[in-house]
């Protein structure tokens, strides 16, 4: 059977033969074969001693260059070999000898070849590493090295990979990154306090490619010839070990201890022993434990370093929990003054964890909630109290959820509702209403709400505070099934149109489901009154289904009290009852489409005009005569937007003209009744929208001016982001969205 060393040497010979071929194709093929061979056996467990063990000797040259900011109580050691000694130093740190340096070299070549794109572009530290490569061949920063192109760096990478196949080659920064990925441990790259301008690129902790929770770390130092007090030239790498390990090795060599054949302690027992007696040395336990010397001292050093950190984090987290139980969080600056070791991100992580997990009910006694301290109690009407005593599933779910989450839901719903009414609440007024919400959270919610409400218009009226809001669209007409929940007093105020404060809009104890029902009633009222076309309904109420609009629209047609008068009835009404800015003149309505002025074809029609020209009771979509028609969005300068044309064309295809050949009751007598009408309308509208969007993307892709998502969303706000990227990926993969 072939031994391990012979297999490694055969792999290196195959890689060296593949280097002679042009390009990297042959070398990558050899690397794939080498990976299969090397995967048949793994690296041995890190244990020192055995055949070929090297006596530890301090490197005086590297010790003179050892920086002050490096880990203390550590010494660089002498390592024998050829080249830059990177793999020899790593083998010495892990196994106490340099016998596995060739295997580390072969595994590094395979790692760098098979993950070439990751080390050049995909890694988080790729820019830092490439900048370090620029300076690795010089002692100071120079314009020539700074201006090296990416193609030159790729060529240097390929040349270094090919050179690594030979034992006498020199290593670079990316070899350290590849070694960290192979060994699955962190590597502390120690750089001398020379070459100050380029030192930050080399003196750093290098993490493996698969960055899991890695705690082990190797210390490797850049050593070489000192030129001046500020410059030095790198020549080789030196392994760095703890001072205790060197002393213990010297003591063990002078006073050898006879082996003890008793049972060895498992690693868990060794950790417990270290926690109880942190001053133990390896020489006292070398015969009783089953771990290596380097692992023992690394554990001892980590327990000494991390014991205080763990205690500090424990006390800081419990201090934050106690402050949360008392009714509020400690500000960040005050918290950092008390616990400077805790980072800002950790503070916010703990804060969101307490807000989301309801820690106030699970940890400690019952204390006043943050909602009770942040929002004052408001006396509720008797009707509302009775309704809440009856209870519902949504109210029970809201009571079971943490109070802080309920408060955040109310605050977010209140802000979204104000924006839907074209009212922009300033932060100072919002904070008076909800003092527990931060400024950043307010602006994040406001930005998202504005994105979901494209119909929002910034005007002077939009800057009114929450105290001046009048819910003219909410509560004027309460359905019979919901009158008990609303209460007589609240319904009376809303029906009379009296001004209502922000606390009346959404009471502190109102569950989220009731607020959604109120928005649904407002949308239903606007649709039944004919003041809300389909396009504006989709933009203003994205959470409601399109079929809901058509159901309400059909109900308004069937109700005799809500039916919109026809053209003949509208001509008999007095002229003063019509709004001049929202409706067309009777003369213009009576004109055929061909006699209208060309200017009227380029101006978008108001929603009231679109709704007023419907004279067929069975129709669900407005007729086509009232909509401006254009051949394409690009053909009419100054005309309506592309999205408006799409909606208008969809309405034309789904509606029936006054002079159409089909009877007016054809659609009403379709199979399935009103449900069938709704389904057909939804399918036709959605298909038309998607077809227009696909055609737009396909034309822009063919003209090599593909739009960004922001531009696409402005033209097609009803299309989801995922759908845009799905179509974009299909186009770039060579597929066709629409044939013809």
UniProtKB/Swiss-Prot annotation:
Keyword Zinc part of the UniProt annotation: no
Chain positions covered by the region annotation Disordered: 485-506, 560-616, 653-673
Principal location: nucleus
Subcellular location per the Swiss-Prot or TrEMBL entry: Nucleus
Listed Basic and acidic residues bias regions: 578-604
GO biological process: regulation of transcription by RNA polymerase II
Mutant lacking the gene: phenotype: Deficient homozygous mice exhibit delayed embryonic development, impaired somite formation, failure to initate turning and lethality between 10.5 dpc and 11.5 dpc. Mice heterozygous for the allele exhibit kyphosis, decreased thoracic vertebrae numbers and missing rib.
Keyword annotations from UniProtKB, A to Z: Developmental protein, DNA-binding, Nucleus, Transcription, Transcription regulation
Keyword DNA-binding: yes
Function: Acts as a transcription factor that regulates development of thoracic vertebrae.
Assigned protein family: Belongs to the vertnin family.
Protein name from the UniProt record: Vertnin
């Amino acid at each position: 059977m072939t031994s391990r060393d012979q297999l490694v040497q055969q792999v290196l010979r195959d890689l060296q033969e593949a280097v002679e071929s042009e390009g990297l194709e042959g070398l990558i093929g050899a690397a794939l074969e080498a990976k299969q061979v090397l995967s048949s056996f793994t690296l041995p467990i890190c244990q020192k001693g055995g055949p070929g063990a090297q006596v530890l000797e301090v490197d005086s040259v590297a010790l003179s260059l050892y920086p002050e900011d490096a880990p203390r109580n550590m010494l660089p050691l002498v390592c024998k070999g050829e080249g830059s000694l990177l793999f020899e130093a790593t083998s010495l740190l892990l196994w106490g000898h340099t016998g596995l340096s060739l295997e580390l070299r072969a595994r590094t070549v395979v790692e760098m070849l098979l993950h070439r794109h990751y080390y050049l572009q995909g890694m988080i530290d790729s820019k830092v590493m490439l900048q370090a490569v620029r300076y690795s061949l010089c002692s100071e920063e120079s314009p020539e090295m700074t201006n090296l192109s990416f193609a030159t760096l790729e060529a240097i990478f390929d040349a270094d990979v090919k050179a690594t196949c030979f034992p006498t080659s020199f290593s670079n920064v990316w070899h350290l990154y590849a070694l960290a990925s192979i060994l699955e441990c962190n590597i502390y790259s120690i750089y001398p306090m020379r070459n100050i301008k380029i030192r930050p690129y080399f003196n750093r902790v290098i993490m493996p490619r698969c960055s899991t929770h890695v705690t082990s770390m190797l210390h490797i130092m850049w050593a070489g010839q000192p030129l001046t007090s500020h410059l030095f030239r790198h020549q080789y790498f030196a392994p760095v070990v703890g001072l205790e390990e060197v002393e213990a090795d010297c003591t063990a060599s002078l006073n050898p201890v006879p082996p003890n054949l008793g049972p060895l302690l498992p690693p868990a027992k060794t950790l417990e022993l270290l926690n109880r007696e942190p001053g133990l040395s390896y020489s006292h336990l070398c015969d009783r434990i089953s771990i290596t010397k380097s692992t023992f001292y690394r554990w001892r050093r980590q327990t000494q370093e991390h014991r205080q950190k763990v205690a500090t984090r424990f006390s800081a987290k419990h201090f934050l929990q106690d402050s949360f139980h008392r009714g509020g969080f400690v500000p960040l600056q005050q918290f950092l003054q008390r616990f400077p070791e805790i980072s800002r991100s950790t503070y916010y992580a703990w804060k969101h964890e307490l807000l989301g997990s309801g820690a106030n009910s699970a940890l400690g006694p019952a204390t006043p909630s943050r909602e009770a301290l942040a929002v004052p109690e408001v006396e509720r009407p008797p009707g509302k109290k009775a309704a809440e005593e009856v209870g519902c599933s949504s109210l029970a779910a809201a009571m079971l959820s943490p109070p802080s989450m309920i408060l955040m839901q109310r605050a977010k719903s209140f802000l979204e509702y104000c924006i839907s009414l074209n009212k922009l609440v300033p932060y100072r007024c919002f904070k008076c209403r909800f003092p527990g919400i931060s400024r950043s959270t307010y602006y994040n919610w406001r930005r998202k709400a504005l994105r979901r409400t494209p119909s929002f218009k910034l005007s002077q009226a939009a800057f009114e505070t929450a105290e001046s809001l009048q819910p003219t669209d909410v509560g004027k007409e309460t359905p019979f099934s919901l009158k008990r929940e609303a209460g007589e007093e609240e319904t009376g105020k809303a029906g009379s149109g009296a001004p209502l404060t922000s606390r009346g809009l959404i009471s502190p104890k109102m569950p989220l489901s009731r607020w959604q029902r109120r928005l649904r009633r407002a949308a239903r009222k606007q649709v039944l009154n004919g003041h809300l076309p389909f396009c504006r309904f989709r933009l203003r109420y994205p959470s409601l289904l399109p079929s809901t609009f058509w159901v309400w629209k059909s109900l308004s047609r069937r109700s005799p009290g809500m039916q919109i008068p026809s053209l003949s009835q509208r001509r008999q009404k007095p002229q003063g009852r019509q709004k001049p800015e929202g409706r067309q003149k009777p003369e213009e309505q009576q004109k055929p489409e061909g006699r209208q002025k060309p200017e009227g074809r380029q101006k978008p029609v108001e929603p009231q005009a679109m709704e007023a020209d419907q004279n067929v009771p069975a129709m669900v979509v407005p007729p086509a005569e009232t909509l401006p028609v254009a051949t394409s969005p690009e053909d009419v300068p100054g005309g309506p937007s592309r999205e408006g044309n799409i909606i208008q064309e969809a309405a034309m295809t789904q509606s029936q003209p006054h002079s159409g050949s089909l009877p007016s009751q054809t659609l009403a007598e379709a199979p399935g009744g009103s449900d069938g009408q709704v389904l057909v309308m939804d399918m036709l509208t959605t298909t038309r929208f998607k077809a227009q969007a696909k055609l737009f993307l396909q034309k822009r892709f063919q003209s090599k001016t593909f739009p960004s998502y922001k531009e696409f969303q402005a033209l097609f706000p009803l299309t989801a982001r995922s759908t845009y990227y799905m179509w974009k990926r299909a186009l770039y993969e060579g597929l066709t969205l629409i044939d013809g």
